């Protein structure tokens, strides 16, 4: 009896230890469970919201060792959508994103640190031909098995960037110098 109990305990510990190791995930863009959104103030009176409809990425998540976490995302900047065709054309122009010259933006994490129940994800954001460090505050929404026999993990992250830091010089007024980033992703664990 003692041997059976010892074996069961050992097996449980092995399973628990195995579930705490880093896992690689692909962002689920096919299932439309991921969003790269932004907002900026309009004249200081309201918020203008937008999204990038085409992006892809991966992340590594280790709940016990955040320093092992990694994030890599590529965004097709021509996919910007603010629900206004003429404004979207202007955002794609050299006044803003210059998508003809820089059709992609990328984010590659350089460090991840646990801060209470959040993760501070610092990385290099390349946008409009400029690379600058940006920190996103991320929170694990949930993780576990999905109905199709796989595993998933979901996060929401927020951050801010200054337009001038990324060579966007169009003056939108004093209330519109920063853009809020609001990112929600669900990843499918890779085998």
Swiss-Prot record:
One of its GO terms (cellular component) is periplasmic space. This is Protein YceI. It is found in: Periplasm. The lineage of its organism: Bacteria, Pseudomonadati, Pseudomonadota, Gammaproteobacteria, Enterobacterales. Gene3D superfamilies: Lipid/polyisoprenoid-binding, YceI-like (2.40.128.110). InterPro entries: Lipid/polyisoprenoid-bd_YceI, TTHA0802/YceI-like_sf, UPF0312/YceI. HAMAP family: UPF0312. Pfam families: YceI. Transmembrane segments: none annotated.
